[in-house]
Regions:
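Short C-terminal tail/terminal secondary-structure segment
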Residues: 18, 94, 106, 117-131
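Short, small/polar-rich loop/turn modules that mediate ligand/substrate recognition or access, typified
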Residues: 45, 50, 116-118
Length: 131
């Protein structure tokens, strides 16, 4: 295996495993992606296709900044305070980066991950262990 040709990595979210009343639609679609990836891994595993899901937690992205802005507007607060407060809720004390998520995807597409299939891996700074 030289590249991520036979492997498939689906990007879901920790919201797919940990329900949040404010994210019902988002969480439901991400949960469906987790289930689909597990089913596809079973179906195509005998063909040598490895399928996994990556579940990012709080990752500092433009999408999260938009969400933080909406939360701040709804509560009469500041977007910066929402971001700071949520980052503090992560056991490692900060948001993750898109590069950290990409590093996991790169690993899953490498020979080192040739026996990993049908699983969901969280990239969330330990937050899932505290939910």
């Amino acid at each position: 295996r030289t590249k991520c040709i036979r492997d498939r990595v689906m990007i879901s979210s920790s919201a797919g495993k940990y329900p949040n009343a404010a994210l019902i639609d988002y969480g439901a679609t991400k949960a469906a992606m987790i289930s689909i990836s597990k089913s596809l891994a079973k179906k195509y595993g005998s063909d040598g296709v490895l399928i996994n899901s990556v579940l990012p937690g709080l990752i500092h992205t433009a999408m999260w900044e938009r969400a933080a802005t909406e939360i701040a507007e709804a509560s009469g607060g500041k977007m910066e305070d929402v971001i700071k407060g949520n980052g503090a809720s992560v056991p490692v004390g900060r948001y993750g980066t898109s590069d950290e998520v990409a590093s996991l995807i790169t690993f899953l597409c490498s020979e080192a991950a040739s026996y990993i299939s049908g699983t969901s891996i969280e990239v969330d700074g330990g937050q899932s262990g505290h939910i």
